[in-house]
């Protein structure tokens, strides 16, 4: 069920809405005991949007939105996962639905004579009853209130609701033409701040992650036969914890890339892309850099160049590595994933066109 109101006058538009949400979660546990895990959640979700146009090239939009997130059936299941005796996990049947408020503003401006554009976005999300983790580490053999037996050094983790989650973002981009290169140049700046609450041995831990990034993109507009893009993106992150300062960490991540597409005589098509990634500040074995280079060559065939046959080679340098970092309220995890490596592919494509 929802209702709304809209007001429009010349350069301004206001829209307000109110929605009633009813969510039904169904689940049934059969082992070790039979248990109905079904839950129902209901909430009222207001929203407001204001748009104002200064002129044909400048406008601003303001948003207020609300949304919810239900716990999963696994989160609600009071069953201990003891597949790892030193790291036990369980659900929590008392979990509530989280409720978030989001404020957002967007501003855009364009100058058609100069060919420039500017865009800025600011958003903040605050969440009540945020679903987070509570972790207890036993200093000695311990029996918890719920009867769970923990060996010395063992951990018990379960989801809980906590207030105080906050996520703020700022994004700006500015674009301008470079006529001498028949290209366009875009600069972008990002800022992020995330506050994630959690519990460690009954104490509140607040993990604060602050990030600042800068990027630029040079893209061509030469012709249909020559197309290239150069880009760079670098981000620096600062992670601080109130209860676990040993998890505090600063790290840097950057990607520089280039892409080139050419249509040569005799309808030969050459494509290549190259990227260089750098990680600094991660765990010792993860601080590394690598380059990824792909290339392909093919030929357009059939009438109107509808078909193309070619050969593609991926990871020519054999350096591809998948690395990621996850920052949570209770731990920081660096992950390296095995990838396929160098390989090639023969491909064929055909473009079906409607005569109408």
Task: Report each predicted region and the residues it spans.
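Residues on the lipid-exposed face of transmembrane beta-strands in outer-membrane beta-barrel proteins
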Residues: 1-9, 20, 48-52, 105-109, ...
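Transmembrane beta-strands of outer-membrane beta-barrel pores
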Residues: 9-11, 20-26, 64-70, 79-80, ...
């Amino acid at each position: 069920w929802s209702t709304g109101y809209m007001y429009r006058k010349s350069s301004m538009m206001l829209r307000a809405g109110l929605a009633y949400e009813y969510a039904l979660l169904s689940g049934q546990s059969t082992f070790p005991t039979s248990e109905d895990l079904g839950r129902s959640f209901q909430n009222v979700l207001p929203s407001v949007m204001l748009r104002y146009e200064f002129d044909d090239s400048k406008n601003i939009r303001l948003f207020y939105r609300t949304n919810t997130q239900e716990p999963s059936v696994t989160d609600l299941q009071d069953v201990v996962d003891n597949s790892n005796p030193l790291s036990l996990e369980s659900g929590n049947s008392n979990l509530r639905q989280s409720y978030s408020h989001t404020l957002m503003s967007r501003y855009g401006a364009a100058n058609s004579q100069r060919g420039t554009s500017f865009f800025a976005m600011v958003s903040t999300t605050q969440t009540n009853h945020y679903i987070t983790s509570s972790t207890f580490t036993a200093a000695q053999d311990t029996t918890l209130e719920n009867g769970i037996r923990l060996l010395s050094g063992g951990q018990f983790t379960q989801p809980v609701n906590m207030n105080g989650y906050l996520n703020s973002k700022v994004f700006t981009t500015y674009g301008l033409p470079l006529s001498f290169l028949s290209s366009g140049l875009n600069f972008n700046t990002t800022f992020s701040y995330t506050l994630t609450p959690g519990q460690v041995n009954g104490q509140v831990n607040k993990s604060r992650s602050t990030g600042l990034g800068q990027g630029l993109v040079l893209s061509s507009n030469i012709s249909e036969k020559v197309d290239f893009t150069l880009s760079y993106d670098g981000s620096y992150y600062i992670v601080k914890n109130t209860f676990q300062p040993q998890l505090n960490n600063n790290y840097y991540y950057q990607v520089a890339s280039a892409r080139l597409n050419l249509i040569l005589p005799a309808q030969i098509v050459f494509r290549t892309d190259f990227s260089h990634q750098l990680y600094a500040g991660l765990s010792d074995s993860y601080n590394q850099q690598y380059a990824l280079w792909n290339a392909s060559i093919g030929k357009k065939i059939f009438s109107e160049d509808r078909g193309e046959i070619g050969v593609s080679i991926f990871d020519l340098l054999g350096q591809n590595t998948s690395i990621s970092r996850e920052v949570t309220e209770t731990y920081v995890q660096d992950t390296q994933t095995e990838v396929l490596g160098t390989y090639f592919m023969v491909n064929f494509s055909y473009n079906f066109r409607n005569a109408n």
